[in-house]
Amino acid sequence: MIEIIEGIYKGRSEGKILVSINGVVFGIITDAESFSEFNEGDKILVYTKLIVSQEDMTIYGFDSKVKKETFEKLIKVSKLGPKTAIKILSSTTVDFLSNAIATGDVEKLSSIPGIGRKTAERMITELKDEFEVVEVNEEMLEAIEALVSLGYSKTQARNAVSKVLKESPNISNVSKIIKEALKILAKI
């Protein structure tokens, strides 16, 4: 198995990233948000899942271990393949998905593009015990939305806001969170 790939980021092309390792360039299918903040030539660490079928060997990659584990859980659901799992992870956050499955919220899951009511019900039935409710900080979500509206990617915004809240956990004013996150993002 290929668990982690470390190499040089070579760009993004049609739903996959290109990673060079000692002159060999791997095409790794990934969700829309993972690795969106990288530039060509950056060193990159990719959590991977190799899926072998009769026709193909495909590497799926993620920017976090949690996202990879979520992908692995999703592809266990009957009639839900890796392509659909990638679409799901491209359309929502792991926390949103975790909360919707853990609480049995069919409506929330059905709001994800590509997920109908029957698929949502199947996901809940087959995965309910594998996900836990994650406490969501409303100020954090609002700050992330504001940063995304300013042109930052969800990943950049989430990372910056998380860093602000880790360094100053008592900040509850959204505008202060955004201001501090912008300082962090300006350094990138």
From Swiss-Prot:
Region spans: Flexible linker: 142
Gene Ontology MF term list: ATP binding; four-way junction DNA binding; four-way junction helicase activity
InterPro entries linked: DNA_helicase_Holl-junc_RuvA_I, Hlx-hairpin-Hlx_DNA-bd_motif, NA-bd_OB-fold, RuvA, RuvA_2-like, RuvA_C, RuvA_C_sf
Keywords from the UniProt entry: Cytoplasm, DNA damage, DNA recombination, DNA repair, DNA-binding
UniProt-annotated stretches for the region Domain I: 1-63
Region of interest (Domain II), residue spans: 64-142
Gene3D superfamilies membership: 5' to 3' exonuclease, C-terminal subdomain, DNA helicase RuvA subunit, C-terminal domain, Nucleic acid-binding proteins
Pfam families, sorted: HHH_5, RuvA_C, RuvA_N
GO cellular component, one term: cytoplasm
Disulfide bonds: none
Keyword Cytoplasm attached: yes
Compartment(s) where it occurs, according to its Swiss-Prot or TrEMBL record: Cytoplasm
Biological process terms in GO annotation: DNA recombination; DNA repair
Chain spans, region Domain III: 142-188
Domain notes: Has three domains with a flexible linker between the domains II and III and assumes an 'L' shape. Domain III is highly mobile and contacts RuvB.
Membership in a protein family: Belongs to the RuvA family.
Subunit structure: Homotetramer. Forms an RuvA(8)-RuvB(12)-Holliday junction (HJ) complex. HJ DNA is sandwiched between 2 RuvA tetramers; dsDNA enters through RuvA and exits via RuvB. An RuvB hexamer assembles on each DNA strand where it exits the tetramer. Each RuvB hexamer is contacted by two RuvA subunits (via domain III) on 2 adjacent RuvB subunits; this complex drives branch migration. In the full resolvosome a probable DNA-RuvA(4)-RuvB(12)-RuvC(2) complex forms which resolves the HJ.
HAMAP family: DNA_HJ_migration_RuvA (MF_00031)
Function summary: The RuvA-RuvB-RuvC complex processes Holliday junction (HJ) DNA during genetic recombination and DNA repair, while the RuvA-RuvB complex plays an important role in the rescue of blocked DNA replication forks via replication fork reversal (RFR). RuvA specifically binds to HJ cruciform DNA, conferring on it an open structure. The RuvB hexamer acts as an ATP-dependent pump, pulling dsDNA into and through the RuvAB complex. HJ branch migration allows RuvC to scan DNA until it finds its consensus sequence, where it cleaves and resolves the cruciform DNA.
Protein name: Holliday junction branch migration complex subunit RuvA
Organism encoding this protein: Fervidobacterium nodosum (strain ATCC 35602 / DSM 5306 / Rt17-B1)
Gene: ruvA
